[in-house]
Amino acid sequence: MRDVDIPVENPGLVRWMLLLGQLGKPDTPEKEFLHEMYFYFFGQELLKSTFIIPMRTHGEIPEANENGVTSFKEGMTFDLAMVEGRDKEQALMFFTDWLRFRQKFGEEWQGLMQPLDGNLGLHDVIINGTGNPEAGAYITESIFNKIKEAHKKDA
């Protein structure tokens, strides 16, 4: 099965984001312990997740080849969904699944499937930026590098 044929779903990542959001800012040793545990598992899921990046093309998207790879024609332009960033000027919007993606962008936008790694050099990333901060995450390059370092021994 081609990677492109596998539905984009990240239930493990969504679970840990929701638990972190429900926990809020830890203000007791018990909550601090839970936060560290939740964040560890969040990082584990984050590293293996594939996301949907909202993309609006100006022109027709070519069909994918037999491997599921789409190559854009020379001169084709597209917009990526961005919002004002914290550490960097702009933040890219990433979604864990098509339901959350469509809730925010409807049918007018297409989705570009990407892992998080390699997308933080120029922009921060907002995961599931649907207006409910407790159900999403804001990822900077430094946070992502710390997560990768913490999980090196897991690989």
Name every feature range the model reports, one short phrase each.
Residues M1-A155:
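An interfacial alpha-helical scaffold signature
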